[in-house]
UniProtKB/Swiss-Prot annotation:
Similarity-based family: Belongs to the SPATA45 family.
Annotated protein name in UniProt: Spermatogenesis-associated protein 45
InterPro entries attached to this UniProt entry: SPATA45
Coiled-coil positions: none
High-level lineage: Eukaryota, Metazoa, Chordata, Craniata, Vertebrata
Signal peptide positions (record): none
Length: 98
């Protein structure tokens, strides 16, 4: 509980958000050692083969923004009643005794 109170005190003192504080802590903790990222480390070679971004630094990565839809009808807002479904066949009578 004391660590939570300390975190809240630090956030209030510096006026930063929790996300920013976590990023700062992770930057201090992350190893930027080139030996760990090289292909010559055989300790985790199997995992690295399956996960190509295994040694990618998370402090410098950003999330990709979604690309806006640029399709043929992206410029118009379609309402649900604009294109009603046409019935090409008469409705069936599925009653058992009909």
């Amino acid at each position: 509980m004391a660590s939570i109170n300390r975190t809240i005190e630090i956030m209030k003192k510096h006026g930063v958000s929790k996300q920013h504080l976590l990023e700062e802590i992770n930057k201090k903790r992350e190893s930027n050692c080139l030996v760990e990222r090289s292909n010559q480390v055989s300790l985790l070679r199997v995992q690295k083969r399956h996960f190509p971004d295994a040694y990618q630094s998370f402090t410098d990565t950003t999330t990709k923004e979604p690309v806006p839809n640029s399709g043929r009808s992206s410029w118009i807002k379609l309402s649900l009643l604009a294109h009603m479904e046409r019935k090409h066949f008469p409705p069936k009578n599925n009653a058992i005794f009909g």
